[in-house]
């Protein structure tokens, strides 16, 4: 991935609920001297005094509040780790507090508490905000930008001057740690359901996570295998954000000229139409003066025009490109999906919410300021939360989306996904697959179509850290509860680092053309 660090952090926020209604131990454990296979991350900084600390009692109270309120609000806190394991983890964290705790260190402890449950939508960003403050103040970070190919962590940008560590190199060690050890440490502070989802977040902002895991460094040693097979090591110096982007601009790496956030509808000829919807939320231009991310009219006009073009073109095949799509809201994506089927449908086979005290208060406030359509998802959610007992987990009867007849498309539908098809993009792909609307091509998504999501948040009393929790559990239309991304019907590998052609798109179009030719060949004469 292109390493543009501040925008990349938005990718982490994009790993959010499929439908919007809507991490590390203390440094004094001397990990290098113990046999712990996943030693504690170093603190972002170690102040000489405790002027920038939380008192021991404040830290303990925040941790206790965190655990108590998560049990009240999280739709299923113990889904992946049972209560006994959580109890032991919280006891371990509390035992580390034997005096004032540096704020940066405590924020990492909060990350560790949240990441322990292995649910991506249960998280805090307190330590990430510390790291971003370091970057914005001119602090230096290790400029490693990476992409995964299978289990291999590959560089996708130049990280230093000279010819060592060229893009496409497979990293084998960072600071003496094997990649598996780096990932194991990262898992302690990054909320992720699966290793694939963990890696996708590391791709988005590895320099930030290295800063949190290793602490400030002037340089780190990186061992690698170059694309040609030669092994090497290099000391990669830390850089300011400005110097890092200047280095990348001075040494550009070829890549497909594609922006996944653009909205594109294009006739490719030979009966194939291409549709890249972009995010399922309003763009900056579409939000207007109100700044409303759910202002849907601009997106509606785009979709109306796109399907009018498709109808006029006489296309028999439609390719929907969801690669790199950060997701958004189902009300947007339904404008597309409803034109591809002649049957009512629901985006999930099950949708349950926990009506915790914070969630009930949040939705009571929303209901007071908004007149919800009782038949809409938001209206049904509001009613279910209001009627449920405090802390109760209740099913929401999802409204069925009705087919849209205007310029409906009844040809062959194909969807292209990758590991960065997040949130509602993964949900749309699962919906198209489960309802037999489309053939899914590409690579497995990192995000999950059966997931804990629809997040809300509360704030801790002393640190002020925002704690994000999932209030809902949704199951994909097929009913599968497997903890896995959307698996394509036709797997397609991404292109190699340094390739400017869109290899995956070319492969997809070749498969569509082959299918068209096969159908033409077998079509009986009239």
Residue ranges and their predicted role:
Residues 18-23:
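Boundary at the C-terminal end of the N-terminal hydrophobic targeting segment
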């Amino acid at each position: 991935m292109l390493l543009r660090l501040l925008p990349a952090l938005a990718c982490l926020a994009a790993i959010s609920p499929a439908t919007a209604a809507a991490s590390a131990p203390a440094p004094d454990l001397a990990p290098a001297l113990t046999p712990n296979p996943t030693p504690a991350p170093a603190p972002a900084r170690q102040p000489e005094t405790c002027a920038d600390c939380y008192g021991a009692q404040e830290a303990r109270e925040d941790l206790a509040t965190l655990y108590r309120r998560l049990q009240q609000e999280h739709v299923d806190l113990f889904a992946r780790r049972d209560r006994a394991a959580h109890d032991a983890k919280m006891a371990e964290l509390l035992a580390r507090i034997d005096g004032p705790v540096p704020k940066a260190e405590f924020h990492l402890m909060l990350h560790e508490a949240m990441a322990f449950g292995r649910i991506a939508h249960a998280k805090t960003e307190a330590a990430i905000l510390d790291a971003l403050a370091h970057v914005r103040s001119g602090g230096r970070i290790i400029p490693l930008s990476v992409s995964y190919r299978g289990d291999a962590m590959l560089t996708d940008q130049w990280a230093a001057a000279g010819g060592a560590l060229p893009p496409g190199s497979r990293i084998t060690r960072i600071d003496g740690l094997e990649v598996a050890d780096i990932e194991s440490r990262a898992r302690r502070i990054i909320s992720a359901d699966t290793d694939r989802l963990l890696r996708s977040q590391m791709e988005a902002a590895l320099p930030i996570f290295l800063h949190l895991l290793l602490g400030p460094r002037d340089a780190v040693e990186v061992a690698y295998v170059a694309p040609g097979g030669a092994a090497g090591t290099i000391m990669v110096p830390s850089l300011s954000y400005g110097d890092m982007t200047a280095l990348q601009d001075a040494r550009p790496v070829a890549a497909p000229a594609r922006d996944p956030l653009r909205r594109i509808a294009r006739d490719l000829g030979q009966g194939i139409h291409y549709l890249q919807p972009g995010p399922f939320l309003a763009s900056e231009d579409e939000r207007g003066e109100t700044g409303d991310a759910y202002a849907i009219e601009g997106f509606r006009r785009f979709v109306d025009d796109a399907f009018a073009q498709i109808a006029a073109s006489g296309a028999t095949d439609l390719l929907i490109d969801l690669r790199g799509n950060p997701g958004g809201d189902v009300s947007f994506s339904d404008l597309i999906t409803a034109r591809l089927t002649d049957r009512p449908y629901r985006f999930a086979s099950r949708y349950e919410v926990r009506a915790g005290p914070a969630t009930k208060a949040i939705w009571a406030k929303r209901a007071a300021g908004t007149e919800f359509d009782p038949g809409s998802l938001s209206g049904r959610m509001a009613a279910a939360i209001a009627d449920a007992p405090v802390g109760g987990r209740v099913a929401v009867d999802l409204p069925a989306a009705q087919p849209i007849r205007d310029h409906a498309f009844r040809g062959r539908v194909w969807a292209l996904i990758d590991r960065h098809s997040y949130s509602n993009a993964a949900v749309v792909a699962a919906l198209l697959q489960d309802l037999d609307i489309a053939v899914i091509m590409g690579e497995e998504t990192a995000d999950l179509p059966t997931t804990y999501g629809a997040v809300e948040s509360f704030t801790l009393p002393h640190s002020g850290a925002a704690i994000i929790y999932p209030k809902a559990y949704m199951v994909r239309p097929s009913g599968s509860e497997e903890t896995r991304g959307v698996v394509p019907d036709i797997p397609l590998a991404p292109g190699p680092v340094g390739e400017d052609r869109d290899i995956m798109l070319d492969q997809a179009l070749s498969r569509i053309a082959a299918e068209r030719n096969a159908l033409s060949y077998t079509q009986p004469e009239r």
